[in-house]
Amino acid sequence: METDEAQDMSQVSGKESPPISDVPDDADEPMPVPEDLSTTTGGQQSVKNERVLAGNIKIETQSDEENGRACEMNGEECAEDLRMLDASGDKMNGSHNGPGSKAMSGVGGIRLPNGKLKCDICGIICIGPNVLMVHNRSHTGERPFQCNQCGASFTQKGNLLRHIKLHSGEKPFKCHLCNYACRRRDALTGHLRTHSVGKPHKCGYCGRSYKQRSSLEEHKERCHNYLQTMSISSNLYSVIKEETNQSEMAEDLCKIGSERSLVLDRLASNVAKRKSSMPQKFVGEKCLSDLPYDATTNYEKENEIMQTHVIDQAINNAISYLGAESLRPLVQTPPVGSEVVPVISPMYQLHKPLGDNQTRSNHTAQDSAVENLLLLSKAKSVSSERDASPSNSCQDSTDTESNNEERSGLIYLTNHIGPHARNGISVKEESRQFDVLRAGTDNSQDAFKVISSNGEQVRVYKCEHCRVLFLDHVMYTIHMGCHGFRDPFECNMCGYHSQDRYEFSSHITRGEHRFHMS
């Protein structure tokens, strides 16, 4: 059952639900309600809320002293029970010499010069004798209206009629748009708001609209607190609140929208950098002149401390993950008669039968050329512990750009490496098993397959700008995040422009970035 039923059923034990006035459409006579106190005597004032609607209509919420205990209903439902009409305007206004005076003398009270009655016990002011009579029941404990089914008693007839609906299950107020039905007219009014299409309450800053004012106020609290945290001047809101002319309002909203777009662009840029850039330390001054707010000193210090802590931890994790050997330059070991020749790392090797008449005098020079062209300082020698790594065992969701290269298993090497001198060995033109297999492509670059020692194809990634090969997709993604969006040799962290890939790699390796004012 609903809260009304739980409340009314509790009246059997002797306690009554709040005697809030309620006159349904089928009520025999109107039941008045006490008037709100505007003045009291001797500190005996009872707190009440009153609204004069039109003429003799009164709406009020009665106190716990008069009602026993407050009902656990929402405000809209209570408003229906509080709406009372007095049919006799003469009695409401109070005639000194008419029949109303006899009724007043019967219920007691003190006549005031304005024609109203004052309770001689607590000092509450009532507009008529009926209202004062209902009020006196809170002092005497009289509850003349009793339910013949459960025995619950009430001080007003309207409350009894509302209680009887709980037993009968009657829900006369039905929604014409859905199957919703209720016992109270004000509850139906609140329900109809859920079907309304319009959202009259609009935020002047971001333009979002809401059906209820309370939702708009909650949104403004979040919006204002966010903007105050970002140190944006609060005069933008005062302009919106004080502006009444629609044309001037639209002008101000355009300014606010442009400044808000700058803030959102900066936030989006920061998110992209955090996702795709290499962990770096930021040194020097941060001159963010393009932002519509002034970054305070405290904000800069907290931001730099947080970045330093997170970046240091990320670098330590990367070193422990990759190992110290990955930071050393790769040195190719010249073959010493073995049929296994290393290509990129000891894990990925080439199988080639070597002839006795092959000369190896130029192996050292060729190995040096390969090392200079293939900057493999960031590639890690994958061990058996990395077989279960997610980046090696399954397809990564961000690996869509290199899917074609992965399916074909091709590694695009530089044009400076001759077809007969790769990785320190002389490669014949014919292809054979467990070897570097040359595949024809549409571009001018040479394409190769890297085969591991057990005959499996190796997945590799290449940066076309720096001509660097990566065996790990995470390291490849971190490296690609360092390239700028407009210019590949522009540092995505600080905007530094490099002349070529060598200067760019040197700048990234040093890891010291400084913001430059444009």
Curated annotation (Swiss-Prot):
Q: Which Pfam families match?
A: zf-C2H2
Per UniProt, the keywords (alphabetical) are:
Activator, Developmental protein, DNA-binding, Metal-binding, Nucleus, Repeat, Transcription, Transcription regulation, Zinc, Zinc-finger
Give the intrachain disulfide bonds. Answer: none
Zinc-finger keyword on record: yes
The record's Gene Ontology biological-process terms are: cell growth; immunoglobulin production; negative regulation of DNA-templated transcription; positive regulation of cytosolic calcium ion concentration; regulation of transcription by RNA polymerase II
Polar residues compositional bias: what residue ranges? 37-47
Instruction: Show the stretches that span the lipid bilayer.
Output: none
Looking up Gene3D superfamilies in the UniProt record yields: Classic Zinc Finger
Organs and tissues of expression = Expressed in embryonic hematopoietic organs such as the bursa of Fabricius, thymus and spleen. In the adult, expressed in spleen, thymus, bursa and peripheral blood leukocytes.
UniProt-annotated location(s)? Nucleus
From the UniProt entry, list the residue stretches annotated as the region Disordered. Answer: 1-51, 381-405
Please, which domain of life does this record's source organism belong to?
Answer: Eukaryota
In residue numbers, the zinc fingers (C2H2-type) are 117-139, 145-167, 173-195, 201-224, 461-483, 489-513
Instruction: Name the principal localization, coarsely classed.
Output: nucleus
> What are the protein's GO molecular function terms?
DNA-binding transcription factor activity; RNA polymerase II cis-regulatory region sequence-specific DNA binding; transcription cis-regulatory region binding; zinc ion binding
Do you know which PANTHER family this protein is assigned to?
DNA-BINDING PROTEIN IKAROS (PTHR24404:SF36), ZINC FINGER PROTEIN (PTHR24404)
Sequence similarity: Belongs to the Ikaros C2H2-type zinc-finger protein family.
Outline what the protein does.
Binds and activates the enhancer (delta-A element) of the CD3-delta gene. Functions in the specification and the maturation of the T-lymphocyte. Also interacts with a critical control element in the TDT (terminal deoxynucleotidyltransferase) promoter as well as with the promoters for other genes expressed during early stages of B- and T-cell development. Function is isoform-specific and is modulated by dominant-negative inactive isoforms.
This chain belongs to the protein called DNA-binding protein Ikaros
